[in-house]
Amino acid sequence: MQVAYHWQVISRLLIALLRFYKLFISPLLGPRCRFAPSCSEYAMTAIGRFGPLRGSWLAARRLGRCHPFHPGGFDPVPDAPASPSSSCSCKGPHP
């Protein structure tokens, strides 16, 4: 239980840093992101949905695609994988 709490604290800290960037730094730089949602919104959603490790990895991959040679466009955060019991059509119990 304690480990999960630490990951939650790290997620909240990362999201707070992203909000700070979005409120105070991003307006100084002007609109630059070629994606929708913006890279900072994408990162906040990914960290909130997948936690700090996988969410940060997804955000880093997104930043790697954010360059002048990529067309950009709509690029949402992937959905969290469904639990095995909700995607399985069998009638038996799952371990």
UniProtKB/Swiss-Prot annotation:
One of its GO terms (cellular component) is plasma membrane. Pfam families: YidD. InterPro entries: Membr_insert_effic_factor_YidD (IPR002696). Its main location: membrane. It is found in: Cell inner membrane. Keywords: Cell inner membrane, Cell membrane, Membrane. Belongs to the UPF0161 family. Could be involved in insertion of integral membrane proteins into the membrane. HAMAP family: UPF0161_YidD (MF_00386). This is Putative membrane protein insertion efficiency factor. It comes from Xanthomonas oryzae pv. oryzae (strain MAFF 311018).
